[in-house]
């Protein structure tokens, strides 16, 4: 999911860089699809294509999930991955439009490969990322074998993750998107599932985790509550109404919320007669009361190293030596998570 325009309004006073180690002993509910897409976009071969096994199956997501999760454990973080379930009906049109855009990007990739345009291959390949059901199932298998808890959300993953954070079972939600704040998560941590180093032009820059707290966002934007934040996001555009209200940018949307106070009053006045593809009040209700489940665990379990080797090395052609070294790190890191959890408790 993504409410990128809302992110433009969240200033420095509501977000701060933190060290990964500051999350030691804390449970973070990670938006699994968001993380997997990050891995697919960033873990690539020199020609811009994703990592693949000998059968031509993409493995970038498994590589990212395996090694990044170990990094989190080594920092003392307790990750729980939350997977999307069935999207709300009013999101289906947007999903279909995204699919068409990806298919078009895939055509551009194939054309660029034929014409030898390597830079364009990399550019369009990132736009053509697909996450198949088989890839998701492999990711779930890997997490199970690693002893990492994962949760199947009935609907939106970020809604479920926010629910877990609101209940105090997780300290924060981990995602690049801001939707979990709309779903009520008290905290959002960004940049957890991305490489700590990123190339910008010719420079390599450090990318630190970023903490955003819901209360700080509401205070900085002078909003009276989460309902107004949701209304603001709807004006700017969400996954359920990507275009938002035509002609209404971030600053104008904020002023409208300050002046009129609610979406209802706006619909009765300045937005009267504006046609919405989806009822905005229906969208707001979904953010306030999404389908969630209480059937989940945040506890780590014992890894099955043999199963990890079977999945990564034997089935997907990962380097046996690299995986063996990573398994040693995994064993040590799990002990660190247990220790830091006890330290945080006492």
Curated annotation (Swiss-Prot):
Cofactor(s) for this UniProt protein: Mg(2+)
Family according to the record: Belongs to the XPG/RAD2 endonuclease family. FEN1 subfamily.
Gene Ontology MF terms in the entry: 5'-3' exonuclease activity; 5'-flap endonuclease activity; DNA binding; magnesium ion binding
Pfam families, A to Z: XPG_I, XPG_N
Subunit structure: Interacts with PCNA. PCNA stimulates the nuclease activity without altering cleavage specificity.
Name listed for the protein in its UniProt record: Flap endonuclease 1
Region: N-domain, residue numbers: 1-102
Residue numbers binding Mg(2+) 1: 31, 84, 156, 158
Function: Structure-specific nuclease with 5'-flap endonuclease and 5'-3' exonuclease activities involved in DNA replication and repair. During DNA replication, cleaves the 5'-overhanging flap structure that is generated by displacement synthesis when DNA polymerase encounters the 5'-end of a downstream Okazaki fragment. Binds the unpaired 3'-DNA end and kinks the DNA to facilitate 5' cleavage specificity. Cleaves one nucleotide into the double-stranded DNA from the junction in flap DNA, leaving a nick for ligation. Also involved in the base excision repair (BER) pathway.
Residue positions binding Mg(2+) 2: 177, 179, 239
Keyword annotations from UniProtKB, A to Z: DNA damage, DNA repair, DNA replication, Endonuclease, Exonuclease, Hydrolase, Magnesium, Metal-binding, Nuclease
Entry note: cofactor: Binds 2 magnesium ions per subunit. They probably participate in the reaction catalyzed by the enzyme. May bind an additional third magnesium ion after substrate binding.
Protein origin, superkingdom: Archaea
Classification lineage: Archaea, Thermoproteota, Thermoprotei, Thermoproteales, Thermoproteaceae
GO biological process: DNA repair; DNA replication, removal of RNA primer
């Amino acid at each position: 999911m993504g409410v990128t325009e809302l992110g433009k309004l969240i200033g420095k006073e509501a977000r701060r860089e933190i060290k990964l180690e500051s999350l030691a002993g804390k449970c973070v509910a990670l938006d699994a699809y968001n993380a997997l897409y990050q891995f697919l976009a960033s873990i690539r071969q020199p020609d811009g294509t994703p990592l693949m096994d000998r059968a031509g199956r993409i493995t970038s997501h498994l590589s990212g999930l395996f090694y990044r999760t170990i990094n989190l454990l080594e920092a003392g973080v307790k990750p729980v991955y939350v997977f999307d379930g069935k999207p709300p009906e009013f999101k289906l049109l947007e999903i279909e439009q995204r699919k068409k855009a990806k298919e078009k990007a895939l055509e551009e990739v194939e054309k660029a490969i034929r014409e030898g345009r390597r830079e364009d291959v990399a550019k369009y390949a990132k736009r053509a990322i697909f996450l198949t059901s088989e890839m998701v199932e492999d990711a779930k298998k890997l997490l199970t074998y690693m002893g990492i808890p994962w949760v199947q959300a009935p609907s939106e993953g970020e809604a479920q993750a926010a629910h877990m954070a609101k209940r105090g079972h997780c300290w924060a939600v981990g995602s690049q998107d801001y939707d979990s704040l709309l779903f009520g998560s008290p905290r959002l941590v960004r940049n957890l599932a991305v490489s700590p180093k990123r190339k910008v032009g010719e420079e390599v820059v450090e990318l630190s985790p970023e903490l955003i707290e819901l209360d700080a966002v509401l205070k900085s934007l002078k909003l009276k509550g989460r309902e107004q934040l949701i209304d603001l996001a709807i004006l700017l555009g969400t996954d359920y109404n990507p275009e938002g209200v035509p002609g209404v940018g971030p600053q104008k949307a904020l002023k409208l919320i300050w002046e009129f106070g609610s979406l209802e009053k706006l619909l009765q006045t300045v937005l009267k007669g504006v046609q919405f593809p989806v009822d905005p009040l229906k969208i707001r209700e979904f953010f306030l009361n999404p389908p969630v489940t209480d059937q989940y665990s945040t506890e780590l379990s014992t890894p099955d190293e043999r199963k990890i080797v079977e999945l990564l090395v034997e089935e997907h052609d990962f380097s046996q030596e690299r995986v063996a070294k990573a398994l040693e790190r995994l064993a040590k890191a799990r002990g660190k998570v247990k220790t830091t959890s006890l330290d945080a408790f006492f």
